Amino acid sequence: MRFPRIIISSDRSNSGKTIISSALMRVLSRKMKVRGFKAGPDFIDPKYHTLAARVPSINLDLWLMGIEGVKKSLIRYGKGYDIGIIEGVMGLYDGINVNYSTYELSEVTKTPIILVVNCSNVSSTVGAIVKGLKDYRNARIRGVIFNQIGSETHYNYCKSSIKEVQVLGYIKYDRNFSVPSRHLGLFTTEDFKETENVLQSVSKAIEESVDIDKIIEIANSAEELQEVDEAISNDELDTKKGIAAIAYDSAFNFYYSENIDLLRYKYQIEFFSPLLNEKIDNPSLIYVGGGYPELHLNELEKSSSTIRWIKKEAEKGTKILAECGGLMYLSKEIIADKSYKMVNLFDISIKAKDKLTIGYTELDVLSDNILGRKGEVLRGHEFHVSKAINLGNDVKFSMKNRIGKGIWENKDGAIVYNTLASYSHFHFSSARGLLSF
């Protein structure tokens, strides 16, 4: 399959990849059908892509999905689109190891790389940075864009240092081009009200000083992709679709777009808001993902109808999956300035803000649950600042971490009835329980 595409990478985080990738999508979308992708497990950056290109951005994560899973997703979501823009994660060679890096994603998908290099407080040294990144593993670097250029003289110094790849242009320094961050990364597009203005401003800067035609030319040089099997097997299709009730509001909005699409094969999707005290009749599945419940504790404590509904459905045996922020909501209480009472399906007390826990997980399934069977090994990702600080004697765990921290003493996957709650986030291309049984 022919699918023109590029990866936007850098030497480090905080280089401007997200806003430049998103603004480039916006510029290209004026004359092409653009699909955004995000290397790695991030939930926030794809929101910027989605706003920019006006289609959902798709995660490509070698740890969570495996090589074949990544290829399937790239092909599945590239069909019908003129170009794909894949934003890398951290620096080019970073990850749990280089085999799970943006570089490796470029290799397995045969995708050319365009570097974004933050040139603040540096000029000619940029040449050494680019050469080092290219030569370290003979990376498919085909171009470079300079970010935070202070003047034409600054640009010329940087440009003259580059010998081996094309300089595609620059983004001038402007403090209004930045997006603020908080404890889990950039502000989400829902919470940062200036997102659209920033996108428009950076898009204009790209149009003025970046060679868009060259970028398209590089994307067109990407090798063809070999077709692979469908994302879901016939055995996993269910013609009698039940309802999957998915929590979605400012407190709970960390979901992989592909997870929701995969659930559509088996369920009719309906969304509800705990913040608005909503519920959905007769669900076959309730899914409460991550997000920022710690910013909405008062409203969540008052969501009495949603709380009663979730407890009733749990006691009936309805499948319930709660990840990270969802785990917090299903706990006994969240402690911040005071104790806020939650659903209390699990006798767990959660401290709202502690040290940042971030990284991949690998878990042995100790007992059957809605995501896996005993003896299986699941991979996930944890990303939170909260912490379990008290645990009742009756809390049971269905998973044990080989890698990662989990909820308590390297155990994760708290289980009661047919409900599973974890600090790990999962990708359903590999954790297929909700699709298979």
Curated annotation (Swiss-Prot):
A Pfam family the protein falls into: CbiA
Catalytic activity: cob(II)yrinate + 2 L-glutamine + 2 ATP + 2 H2O = cob(II)yrinate a,c diamide + 2 L-glutamate + 2 ADP + 2 phosphate + 2 H(+)
Biological or metabolic pathway of the protein: Cofactor biosynthesis; adenosylcobalamin biosynthesis; cob(II)yrinate a,c-diamide from sirohydrochlorin (anaerobic route): step 10/10
Active-site residues, Swiss-Prot/TrEMBL: C324 (nucleophile)
Entry annotated with the keyword Nucleotide-binding: yes
Note: The a and c carboxylates of cobyrinate are activated for nucleophilic attack via formation of a phosphorylated intermediate by ATP. CbiA catalyzes first the amidation of the c-carboxylate, and then that of the a-carboxylate.
Protein name: Cobyrinate a,c-diamide synthase
